[in-house]
């Protein structure tokens, strides 16, 4: 599917289908001035459809009408935009996704014109439509025996905004990164495991000319990564510590690290998860790694002047005679000792060594991403990501990037008093604290493994997965927060 901006008006456009946006009206809508010429060209059909369907432009309402065989346009889509005062780039993106869903199963539509109000600027409008169309179209059918035919739609023309190649390229790259992340998360643990995840990243590195260093188990032992290897001990599959690097041409403006939790399956270990959805969903526990490498794909395409290190300590958390037990003591690569009082709080153990490794690279900021705690979902629900940071400037930069991305974040406290709950009588700390404030104590645990570098922790346990098709998301992995990470790097 090709998306392009155009200076052409709706009145002059010709193709299979055209989508026209209308703001909500409490009274009967009339054809706006900018569409009267098109309505005349279509013999008044726009006004007729509005009257016959009592279309009032309510948000989420979409009317599709097939026109006569002699009409210059074959299908007319009237799209409700809701309250004009609430129109913004996020609403535009959602609107484009709704249009994509409305037309993707229609084999008669190969060309689509979009006449929608500008949101902020013409460039932002082009980017938002691009994101909405690509993500609204996306379905992951890789594992079905009968494949659906691809959508017939070949070209989308955004009318009245002029040529916007840079904005459309940005939106396209963001979507490709999101979709890569979604497919990693959606793949079950017999498809994506530490070995195949590393192979996928190796292919990514080869495609984009990125540097790649994969530390094998012996390398991790030599580096003293006892925390990571404690989690990996029970699995029959070898752990893979993945370090992917994007370097710009010339001197980089900045050097940062993105660290993603990479548990390709989490049984809970000896603190085994209960049967049912809790354990069945644990293929998604590498959502942080998926977002990390999805961001890498987009950044490699966009080529910013920032050096970025993408890191994930990838393993499974399984059960065997070799596995870590409740009460075991692990030693992380910074020398700190950890009493394991819950084998199902394993993600932070893998992140501990990954954060130590990242800081040794001499980066100016570290952001970790993890499906870390159910406590964060209890606090913020499944739409909002928890953000913790020891640096106000970094926290603000991520918040600003999230606004550009349209992904929801909420900054949470790093309450030092709560570290009391992590204290151990026999080690430097335990890996879990009391039930209360569980997402905060998890962040405080991670903070112990970053000494002097600005650091932020993103708990994506809620928004990493969607239970239904909604907005730009399809059921399954969401690719959250690839777009925020990319906007942060670009800024």
UniProtKB/Swiss-Prot annotation:
Give the UniProt subcellular location, in the record's own words.
Answer: Cytoplasm
Q: Name one GO biological process term.
A: proteolysis
Q: Cite the entry's keywords alphabetically.
A: Aminopeptidase, Cytoplasm, Hydrolase, Manganese, Metal-binding, Protease
- Catalytic residue positions: 273, 348
Question: A Gene Ontology molecular-function term?
Answer: metalloaminopeptidase activity
> Which family is annotated?
Belongs to the peptidase M17 family.
Q: What is this protein called?
A: Probable cytosol aminopeptidase
Classification lineage? Bacteria, Bacillati, Cyanobacteriota, Cyanophyceae, Oscillatoriophycideae
* Gene expressing this chain: pepA
């Amino acid at each position: 599917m090709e998306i392009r901006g155009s200076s052409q008006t709706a009145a002059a456009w010709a193709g299979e289908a055209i989508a026209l946006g209308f703001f909500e009206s409490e009274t009967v809508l009339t054809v706006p001035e900018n569409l009267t010429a098109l309505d005349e060209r279509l013999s008044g059909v726009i006004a007729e459809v509005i009257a016959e369907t009592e279309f009032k432009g309510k948000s989420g309402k979409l009317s599709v009408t097939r026109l006569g065989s002699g009409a210059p346009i074959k299908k007319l889509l009237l799209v409700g935009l809701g309250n004009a005062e609430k129109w913004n780039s996020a609403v535009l993106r959602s609107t484009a996704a709704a249009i994509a869903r409305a037309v993707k199963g229609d084999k008669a539509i190969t060309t689509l014109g979009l006449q929608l109000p500008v949101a902020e600027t013409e460039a932002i409008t082009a980017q938002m439509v691009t994101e909405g169309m690509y993500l609204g179209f996306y379905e992951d059918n890789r594992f079905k025996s009968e494949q659906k035919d691809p959508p017939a739609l070949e070209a989308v023309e955004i009318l009245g905004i002029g040529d916007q190649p840079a904005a459309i390229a940005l939106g396209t790259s963001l979507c490709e990164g999101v979709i890569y992340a979604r497919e990693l998360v959606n793949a079950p643990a017999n498809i994506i495991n530490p070995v195949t995840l590393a192979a996928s990243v190796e292919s990514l590195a080869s495609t984009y000319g990125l540097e790649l260093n994969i530390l094998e188990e012996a390398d991790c032992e030599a580096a003293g990564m006892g925390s990571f290897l404690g989690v990996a001990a029970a699995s029959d599959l070898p752990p893979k510590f993945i370090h992917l690097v994007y370097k710009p041409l010339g001197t980089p403006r900045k050097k940062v690290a993105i660290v993603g939790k990479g548990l390709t399956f989490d049984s809970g270990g000896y603190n085994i998860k209960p049967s049912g959805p809790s354990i069945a969903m644990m293929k998604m526990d590498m959502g942080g790694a998926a977002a990390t490498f999805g961001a890498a794909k987009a950044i490699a395409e966009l080529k910013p002047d920032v050096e970025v290190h993408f890191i994930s300590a990838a393993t499974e958390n399984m059960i065997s005679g070799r596995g870590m037990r409740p009460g075991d003591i692990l030693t992380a690569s910074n020398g700190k000792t950890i009493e394991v009082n819950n084998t199902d709080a394993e993600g932070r153990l893998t992140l501990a060594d990954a954060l130590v490794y990242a800081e040794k690279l001499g980066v100016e900021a570290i952001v970790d991403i993890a499906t870390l705690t159910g406590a964060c979902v209890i606090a913020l629900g499944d739409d909002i990501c928890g953000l913790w940071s020891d640096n106000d400037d970094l926290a603000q930069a991520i918040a600003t990037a999230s606004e550009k991305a349209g992904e929801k974040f909420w900054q949470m406290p790093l309450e030092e008093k709560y570290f009391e709950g992590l204290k151990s009588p026999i080690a430097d700390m335990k890996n879990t604290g009391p039930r209360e404030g569980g997402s905060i104590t998890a962040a405080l645990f991670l903070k112990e493994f970053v000494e002097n570098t600005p650091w932020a922790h993103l708990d994506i346990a809620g928004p990493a997965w969607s239970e239904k098709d909604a907005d730009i998301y399809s059921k399954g992995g969401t690719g959250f927060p690839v777009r925020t990470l990319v906007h942060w790097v670009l800024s």
